């Protein structure tokens, strides 16, 4: 195929698609140019059906640092494992694409998106989602698309599609919505406590833009699309299915209705094992034994799936006996752990999450370096899902895509209510440990996170709660479920997570297994979620009504001091020598910003006070008129040097020692004497002159008009002292003042 180019203008930017020039051995490949962003999207499919009992779809999103004109970091100086943002983008693309393949499609499919050039004002993730759908659509892969996605911002009471970087800075909403021409099938959002009505409007506004992109894809497919390949779909033997259903359906249906999760799982497992054992014995010598037994396992899964859905849609009964809008029993507890900076334990039925708060200096913020300009991330929310939480053994190690995604969802929900850095200058980390799971563990982690933040004294604007909504639909009728459990998530059509405060929504996430849902379903789910959210907030607030006024004793305390910008180098010292010494001596952590704000962190207030005193002395400057009681550190013929503070000395000229004439300095003071002096002059070089006599009573004049003895004049000069030159803590030393008579 020769290169063909298609172009449209979308939201004020050119959207150009090139087909037939690159990656021609793949099933489908397109180059998408949106503004100055360029993404290569490639789709490939295996020739045969995979042996897995699921659809093996893999979506990758690769950020090449050269796309932004940046050099990769690290020792190897090349791209390594995907960043968190890249992982999340891959999930965003996977979620709306996956439902668009036929039931029983088991061929392995890979979709690879590579960002080749990057324009921060033209969304690379949305270009990649568009390219992924189009690469599949023009290929021979049996994909029932196309789909498209857009970003939606909300500022000045207006919605902005695919906002620029500057638009995002002022937006109250960060929404990504995807779908087909007919319906929405994926949502991901963070919001600043927006109402359900505004969120629904944003979703519908986004869907209008999606329709335009889908039309453009259909136009391209009509021009260059390949004929779809004939592939074998996984199907069970119809006669075998009818036979098993006739004998075992009622038995399995009874097991499904056992209310307690572990008991229900044991009951359904017993039925399935009985059926499987029967057919293993019956077909022990059959050459198609493996195929038959595979079909038996799939048929039993389909029977359980059908019964769960029938119970809900026809009988309006859920497997655990709840009403469709009923939440499982709730419990909230704070201070579950000693020593930590804050902790919260939240339980909803058989789902339980422990959240642990850690506060740290701002120097511990995470440095994020990707295609966007480097920035520091202050708030981290990490989510861990060990297999013991569902009573199983399994892989234990680094977090997978699901754990990363759930962690960021909680981060998005809670970030909206955190105090500003000016109000609360701490880096904040929450870790959610899922201890038990029967669905909606990500939302339990949000509730537990709220408890930990409030218990730890973080002054959040309002508590946040999360709830997961479900859907069972037969194409004509549907039922929206509140607080779905694992079985309903597994066999249902939708997982719609809604988090927020009493004022509004802070996060949304929706995944579905059908091609899309209508605005009516969205509206009902949001309204039902609001009622549930308020019920959960009642329980959270009964455990702790508002954030504590003080941090935990183990949390780092903070104090600050403002220093002149030109003194920053004094506090830091050569190669960090001075600040390192302060930290070593006091055990504190010190942050200094470019405007001279010094923040001192420690769990020991005395250590903070010591460090603050040292820093104050380092940057301290004498002022004319100040009075000090200080030691005499050096004697010269022309006067005495006294040590004011740090490395700052002052000269008390011989004429300023006493009102009467002084022949020798030693007649008045000696090294080591403590004297009280007043600063009388600071010259342009910072040299300090002080006086003792100005603080003494002035004697009355005698008959000759002199103060006591004959007043004599002397001319002498003094030089910069070196008595304290070895100290590291002095910003400056006094030089000798000019000759005085």
From Swiss-Prot:
One Pfam family linked to the record: RNase_PH_C
Cofactor(s) the record lists: Mg(2+)
EC numbers, comma separated: 2.7.7.8
Listed GO CC annotations: cytosol
Ranges annotated as biased composition (Basic and acidic residues): 698-713, 723-741
Enzyme class per UniProt: transferase
Domain KH, chain residue ranges per copy: 556-615
Location in or out of the cell: Cytoplasm
Gene3D superfamilies xref list: GHMP Kinase, N-terminal domain, K Homology domain, type 1, Nucleic acid-binding proteins
Listed name of the protein: Polyribonucleotide nucleotidyltransferase
Biological source species: Streptococcus thermophilus (strain ATCC BAA-491 / LMD-9)
